[in-house]
Amino acid sequence: MRCYNCYKFSLASFCTHCKEELQDYSLGVRKLEGGLKVYYFYHYDDIKHLLHTKHRFYGYFIFHALARLSFAKFRNFFNPPCFINVIALDDKTYGDYSHTAILAKYLKTKFIKPIFYTLQAKSQVKYSGKSLHFRKTNKRSYELKKIPKYPVILVDDIVTTGLSLLEAKEILEKNNIEVLFALVLANAKFDTI
């Protein structure tokens, strides 16, 4: 087997060196329109080769490994005083798995409960590599399939323009559901607060 990051021999998903490097993140925050805070673990350029595996079979293993190094650690120091639901954006299964559902699963604790297949995009348009104008004119058109009981944390893999997260927040707030913040693996823009 090989390390998914550096391709050196490794029995685990990441070799010892890469695992240490990926564990050494500093949680960043980016503020979107309307005040939505998006917390992220990595800069997009640092892990884009790993993120691009999300539509491949082996991406399943990479996303589990990344979630163990980031989202699972987040839940260890984030101790909410109340119950919270986690919603993964558009967690439909593409191929064999949903990469956003994998990330959401790793946030589960006594007080944090992921709920799956809750917020689904009616539009199947892919945003990867598209312009801001394209993204604004081709919305996700989310549909709320389940009503969460508690305030919500939104989960996605990447924040680029933030339009998907803002659209998700809008539909939830229209249904009187409080959105606390969003949590993503990577930030693809460097206008952080």
Regions found by a protein language model. Give the residues of each.
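PRPP-dependent phosphoribosyltransferase catalytic core
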Residues: L166-I193
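Active-site-facing substrate-recognition patch
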Residues: T16-F83, T118-P148, A186-I193
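Activation segment
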Residues: T160-T161
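Short cysteine-rich clusters marking metal-coordination/redox-active sites
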Residues: C3-C6, C15-C18
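Substrate-recognition/cap helix-loop segment adjacent to the acidic, metal-dependent catalytic center
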Residues: G95-K113
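Short glycine-rich phosphate-binding loop at a beta-alpha junction
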Residues: P80-T93, V152-I153
